[in-house]
Amino acid sequence: MNTNSTTVASSFLNDLKTQTADSHKKLEELPVSMSIMSPDMKIEEYAKYLNLMHDVHADTEETVFPLFSGLLDDLEQRRKKQLIEADLSYLNCDVTSFEKVFKTENISIPFALGILYVVEGSTLGGRFILKNVSKVPQLSGDKGVSYFNGYGDKTGSFWKSFLNFLSEYEQQNNCGDAIIEGAVFAFDSIYNHFESR
């Protein structure tokens, strides 16, 4: 990438972050979101959050991932539904019945990239959440926290790799508005899902 391309990519990523900030903040302020950052977090709250995120990842893997087959080299490594299932199993909690989160049809690749931006961003944020949930004795060590562990010590590099792919795709296809629209849609859809359950 030359300097001009890097500037354009940085500008787009800044716009994406800025234009999704309100939706992101609104989601983080929901009681269920705040519960997992509480020093008094209960295992029941943790399991509820995991079940909600299971729906998010199940829908992403079913609806969004197929659009990136052959485009995103490390797509299979980005699956997280099984990590949530392993954590819930460790806690002797059932996976609740699946509920669709992203209720829309005919998702374009740019729109889907916006959704994936939010879902991948949650993995990066999960590393911060991990610090809190790991304080619960039942979750200490590596048991019950595989979802929030994300990609382990490679989480940062996976995020950078995704942002590079996102930026290059946006530059080549001039589709920033659709990506931003997809990201806002994802934050709002997850918010509605969390609030309804």
Predicted segments — roles?
Residues 1-197:
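Metal- and O2-centered redox machinery and metal/ROS homeostasis
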